[in-house]
Amino acid sequence: MLGTLFFDKQDRELLRMINETIDHGPSQDLEHKVFDANLHPHGILELTTTHEYRMAHAVINLLGNLEAGGAPDRLMALRILRDEVLHSARTPFRYNTGRVLIQIMKEIIRSRQDELTQLKLVHDFRKVTSGNPRLVRQFLNTYHLLEMPEEWNQLTVDHHVHDANTKGRKNATHLIMDAWIKGIRYITVVYYNYVEPAAARELLQAAEIMGVDVRIGLEFRTPFRDRFVCFVWAPRGFSDPEAFLSFLAERPMVALMNEGRKASLWMQRHVMDTLQLWNAKHAPALAEELEIPVPLLEPEAFLAYVGTGQTSFLHLAEYAHKTLLKHLVQRVKALQEEALTATSERQSQIAQLIRRMDMLTTEVIMETWLKPERNPELPSPDVPDNAPDTPELLRMPPHVLLDWLSCLRSGYRITLQLAELTAEDVLELLWDCQGMITHLELFNLKEWQEGHLRHLTAINDLQIAINKGSVLHLKQILRGMIRTLEASSSEKDKERCAKFRIILRNIPSLQAPYKVAPLRIRIGTDSTSHSGVRHGMGLAMPETLPHGARRQIARGKQFRPIYLPVSLSLEFRETYAEQERYSFFMRWLGPRLRRIWGFGHFGLRCTKEWRAISGITQIGEEGNVITMGGIGGELNNGLRAERTEKTRPRWLGFSRLSTPISNTLKVLAGFIPALVTFLYTQEWWVLAWFGAPLWFLITGLRNIPQAILGGGGMWSRSLLRWNDYVSWTRVCDSLLYTGLSVPLLEYFIRVLLLEDGLGLTVKDHQFLVFSIIAGANSIYISLHNIYRGFPKEAIIGNLFRSLLAIPVSVFYNDVLALFLPFFTTADPLLILEPGAAIISKTASDTVAAIIEGLADWRNNRRLRYWDYETKLQRLFDCYAKLELAFPDQDILSLLSRPEEFTRLTSTEARSLQVESIINALDLMYFWLYQPCAQQTLTSILRTMTREERVIVARSQGILSRVREVSQLFVDGLLGRNFARALSFYLDSYENYILTLNKRCAGFSNGHRPLLRRRRHISDCL
C-alpha cells in the first residue's frame, strides 16, 4: 500500500543510486560525471543525470574523503555542490534554498539504515528544489537554521574555531561547508603552534569556493606570571591562497613552524604520559568499580585515531570513551537481563550501576581522570617550565614572542585570549607588548560557559578607556588597581604595583599605539564540533537578519539561542554604483532620468552592508549577539533508553503522497466544492451542471499560454516543445485554488453578500458587481500566490489585476449580450446575471495569463542571467589562461581555425581544450533547451564590446571538431549515459554555430554596424 500511495518513482530511483554510492563508493565513471567543475548544473549535464543525484554524490565524497590525500576530491566536490545548490532554486530565494538542500542531503546520508526516513527526506528534497520560500522557511526551522538575507550581507562571525588538523572533528572543507550552511560569513580557524601548508591550502580554497571570509590564526602560549597566556597571530594582506602559501614557504616562517612543531610534540609527550597513567592507574580502578573489563589504550592506535590532528587531552578522552563504550553496552545488556530475576535490593544496585555507566561520557572521563590537575603525579603542561627539554617557543616572554611575530609580516592581527586573566593582567601585557596586541578576544563561548571569563567587565572598561583616549578614565582605573595591589601582602603584587606606578606616569605612552588603530575585539565559540555539551559554531547579530529570522528568534520555539552579554555597535551602509555593463539605450537614458527628483538612483546597483564597529563594545547583562549553533547531543551514552520496535506507519501524511495521486486529489478537492456551489446557486441547468467544468476549463487553458509566455517560447527557436514549458503539478495547484474560489466568489460574495445582503445584481449594478467580485478574486489569488511562493511581480500584479479585469469583464459581458440572441430566444440578461462569476473569472484569468506569464518570463530571465554570468565568466577565464599559456600565439585568430587550435592544445594544454569544449557544449545547451536563454544571451551580447563578442562567437567553433568532442563523451566526461547528449550535439552543433555567429555579428557599437551583411560571417569572426 505504501509503495503505491506514497513517494514517487523518481524518489525511489534517486535513493537507490544514493545508497549504492554510499555502500560501494563512486566508480571512475561517476567521478567523471560529477567531478568536472566546468560542467554547469543547467548545461548539457542535464541530459545525463539529475542534479539531485549530483548533489548527493558531491556530499558523499565531501564527507567520506577524510584522509589527507582526499583534499582535492573534497574541494572539487564542494565546488560542484555549491554550483548545484545555487542553481537549483527557481526563485530568488537561492542561498536559503541551497542551505536547506545540503542539510537535507546530509540527513539522507546519515539515515542510511532507515529506508523510510530516507524516502521522506528524498521526497522533501525534491520539493524544496522549487525554492518556494514558505517550504524553505519551514525546513530552516526544522533544522534549527536561521533565515539569511538573500543579499548575503548578514553579520555572522566566529573568530575561534578548530578543524580536524588540531582538535576538531571536521576536515577543513567540511568545516567551511557547515559554516556556509549556518550562514557564517566571517570565520577564523585557529591552529596550535604551526599549520601544515596542505591544511592551509584546503581551508583557503574551500573558503574561496563558498565565499566565506576566512583567516588562519596560529595560537601560541607564552609564560606570564607562573602560567601560560595565549595569543592568536593572524597574518594578513594576502591576495589569494597561493600568496599565503608562498608566505609559509619563506625561510623565517619555516623556522617558526619548526619551533611550533617542537612545542606541539612537547604537548604530545604530556598527553602520552597521561595515557600511560590511565592504563596503569585509572583503567584498573574503573574496571573494578563498573565490574567490566576496561581495555588498555595502545599508543600507536591512539595516534592513528588522532590522524592529521594535533594530539590533545580531548582526543585522549574521546578515544578512551570509544574503546570503553562497547563494553558498557554489553555489560548493561547483561545487567538488564539479570534484573528480570533479581531481588528488589539487587535491582536498585543494578539501576544505580547502569545510571553510572550511562553518564560515563567523554566529558566525564575528561573532567574526572585526564585533566592535568587530576594527575598531580605528572608535570602539568599548563605550568611554565624552564627545563632543558622545554621548547624555546614555550619559554619566550610575551613581548619577545610578539616582536618575533611582528617582524615576519607587516600586516598582522595579534589577539590576546582572556581566559583566567584579570584587568591587571591585560594592562600589564598591553604595556609590555607596546601596541603589538591589536585585538582582545573579549568573548569566548567555551571559556564563558566554563566560568573562565570572570573579569570581562573590568577588562572591557579598560579597553573603552584606552580607545576613547580618556586620560581621566584611564587614570581612575590605574589608581584603583594600584590601591588594590597596595593592600596585598604578596611580593609579586608589590612588584606589580611599582610597575603600575610607572605606567601611571606614562599614560600617553600606553595610549599612543591605539590612537591610530584602536584596540579591537574578537568574539568566537572555540568550537571543535566534538562535545555535546557545548554550543556549535557561529555568532549572529539579529539586527542584520531578515524579519522572519528575528521573529523566529523572538518566539524561541524550535530555535532557542543564548543572548550573550556582548553589545556591538553596528552601522548600515548603502552604496550606489553604476552597472559594469550598460546597453546603449541605458547609457543614454540613465543620466537623464537621474536628474529628475525621485529617480536619483535609477539604473544604479545598490549594495547593502552591515559592519561592526569593534572598537566600541559593551559587556552587560544581555547584548545583541546570539549563538547560532545548538547543543550537539544528550549528556549520556543512551544506555538507559528503551528500545522499541519501529512499526511502519500506514499513513505518512498528504505531503508524502506520490505526485499523480496528490495531483488527482488536488483537482478533486477543487472540483467538488465548485460543482456543489454551482448546483446550489444556479437555477439554469446549463450553469448548474457545466459551470464547474467551465470554470476549470478556463483555468486549465489559461495556464498553458501563460507557461509558454513565461518560457519565452513564442519568440525563440529552441528545441523545447509547448508541453515542456507546462508544469502539470502547477496546473493542478491552480485548479485546486480556482475550485476553492468558486464558493468564495459565487456563493459568499455574489449571493450572500451582494444579492441577499446588499441587493446588488448584475442587471442593476453591472459595473459595481463585477468590481467587487474581481477585487475579492485578486486578494484571494495574491494570498495563495504568496503561499505557493510565486515571484513578487506576480503577487503585486494580481493585487491590481482587478482594475484591469473590470473593463475586460464588461467587454466580455457586452459581447455575450450581443451574440446570445443568435443562439437562444431567452432574455440575455437572464443568462448573464447568474453567469456573472464565470464572466468575471474569464476576464480575471485573461489578465492573469499576461501578468503571471510576464512574471514567469522575468523570473526565467533572472535564472538565465545567473547561468550566463557563471558560464561566460568561465569562458573568458579560459581564454585568459590560453593567452598566458601561449604568449607567442594569436589566440583570437587561432580560435577561428578550430583544427589548428585543437592540434596546438592537444599537446600543450589538454585541460584548457577540454574546458573550452565544455563551455561551448553548455552554451549550446542553454541556447537550445533553457527557457528565455536566447533573449537573455542577446541582451548580454548587446552590452559587450566587439572583442568580447568575437571571443564568444569564435570559442563556439571548437564544436565543429566532431572527433575530439565525441571522444570526450566516449571517455566518460558525462558518465555512462551519454547517448542522448551525444545525439543532441551531433544534431545541433552546425545550426547553433551559424545562428550564434549571426547573432554576434548583428550588433553595432555606437551607430556603426559591427559587420557588413554582404560579408560571410565565418570570414569576419
Q: Model-found features: residue ranges?
A:
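Non-catalytic, alpha-helical, charged scaffold/linker segments
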Residues: 243-359
